[in-house]
């Protein structure tokens, strides 16, 4: 089982991830983290996500380094992600990032860190955006260099 921490666990994507992890036979939710002060802190992450209780309470900080964790999935804020990547680097944890609005210097830092720890980063994981990108890719293969494809 791959042990996953979801950062931004009470948000829309975080809740969807927790639901998906619950349905997976190869993934296990090990930690659900969100912003300090949210009313969901201390609540069961399964219940917050609209599924049955899973016993993983939403916390406002990553578990201690001694806790067994295989990967971090971050759908937080740009500021939080900038801090989270440093924690993942320190702990040598792979991270998947779906946070939007990262500053250029943070993206540069991600590129450097990716030589040390595995990083998957996309600004947008929505189905609509990814379907559009796939359609543009297909159109460019069909039309080749004869047309200029632009998304407005």
For the regions a protein language model found, what residue spans apply to each?
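Short acidic low-complexity segments
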Residues: 54-68
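Rossmann-fold NAD(P)-binding glycine/threonine-rich loop
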Residues: 79, 85-91, 98-121, 130-138
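Conserved anion/nucleotide-ligand pocket segment
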Residues: 8, 127, 131-152
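NAD(P)H cofactor-binding loop motif with strongest signal on the N-terminal glycine-rich segment
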Residues: 9, 76
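N-terminal Rossmann NAD(P)H-binding glycine-rich loop of SDR-like oxidoreductase domains
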Residues: 10, 14-18
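NAD(P)-binding Rossmann-fold cofactor-contacting core
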Residues: 23-51
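Extreme N-terminal starter segment of soluble prokaryotic enzymes
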Residues: 1-4
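N-terminal Rossmann-like NAD(P) cofactor-binding module of classical short-chain dehydrogenase/reductase
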Residues: 72-73
């Amino acid at each position: 089982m791959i042990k996953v921490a979801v950062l931004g666990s009470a948000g829309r994507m975080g809740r969807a991830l927790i639901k998906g992890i619950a349905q997976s036979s190869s993934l296990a939710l090990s930690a659900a983290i969100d912003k300090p002060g949210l009313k969901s802190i201390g609540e069961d992450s399964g219940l917050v996500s609209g599924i049955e209780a899973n016993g993983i309470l939403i916390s406002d900080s990553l578990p201690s380094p001694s806790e067994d964790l295989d990967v971090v999935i971050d759908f937080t804020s740009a500021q939080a992600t900038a801090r989270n990547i440093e924690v993942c680097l320190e702990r040598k944890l792979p991270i998947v990032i779906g946070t939007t609005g990262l500053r250029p210097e943070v993206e540069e830092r991600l590129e450097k860190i990716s030589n040390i720890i595995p990083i998957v980063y996309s600004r947008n994981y929505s189905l609509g955006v990814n379907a559009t990108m796939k359609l543009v890719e297909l159109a460019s293969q069909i039309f080749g260099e004869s047309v200029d494809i632009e998304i407005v």
